[in-house]
Amino acid sequence: MRLKEIISKIEKRHSKKIDLSLNRTFNLLKKLGNPQNKLNNVVTVVGTNSKASMATALSAILKEAGYKYNLYTSPHLQSYTERFVFNNKEINENDLADLLGGIDKILGNDSATVFEILTCAFIKYAEYFKDNINIIEAGLFHRFDSTNVFKQNLLTLLGVIHLDHLNWLDNKTIDGVIYEKTSSLPISNIFINNQMNSEIKTKIKKSLIENKSKKYFFGDNFN
């Protein structure tokens, strides 16, 4: 019940469910001590479909191999706790209520969307397990998504891209979608994309031409 009350409270923090901007996210992260700069081993997961599948599959592989991970995904099926996994274990309701309640107090009179608050909460709590591999699924696109706060990644997983959420775009084309999802991706030790459509894959490569990540593309480097 306490978690539901806190969620209800933070839902009133901003008039819009989605408001594409990074200003509020960085403002809250600054109040939290910029925890995004203290996390290592960040894995960013972006795409149109299959983001959650890729993230959970990677977490299963890491667990089997004996690694510890933190996992942030959205949306959830039954409880907000499903979105938060730390040290290979889903957070419990009491701990999440404490976490979000603390974040809400620190935010003060400033505004932020629910997703922005949840993302910042995950990043802050992950500090306690900062040596773990941090798997973070992007929300809407990536450029102005609250998960886009890391300067460098261990790994970027880019799933299949196709037309989606066009109501949020001025450029309502596949080029517009690709730009929003890829132009802001951080430099990663490894970048993997499983785009099968050759035309879209070519556009993705063009968008990433200045990104110095070591890139692997389906059909080019693996099958």
List PLM regions with ranges.
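Conserved beta-strand segments that form the floor/walls of ligand-binding pockets within enzyme
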Residues: 44, 85, 157
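Catalytic cores of secreted/periplasmic lytic hydrolases that degrade extracellular macromolecules
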Residues: 51
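Surface-exposed charge patches
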Residues: 60, 124, 206
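Acidic, Mg2+-coordinating active-site environments of NTP-dependent enzymes
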Residues: 40, 130-137, 153-223
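Short, basic phosphate-binding NTP loop
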Residues: 1-45, 54-67, 72, 76-81, ...
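ATP-dependent carboxylate-amine ligase
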Residues: 1, 151-152
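ATP-dependent carboxylate-amine ligase catalytic core
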Residues: 22, 29-30, 35-39, 64-151, ...
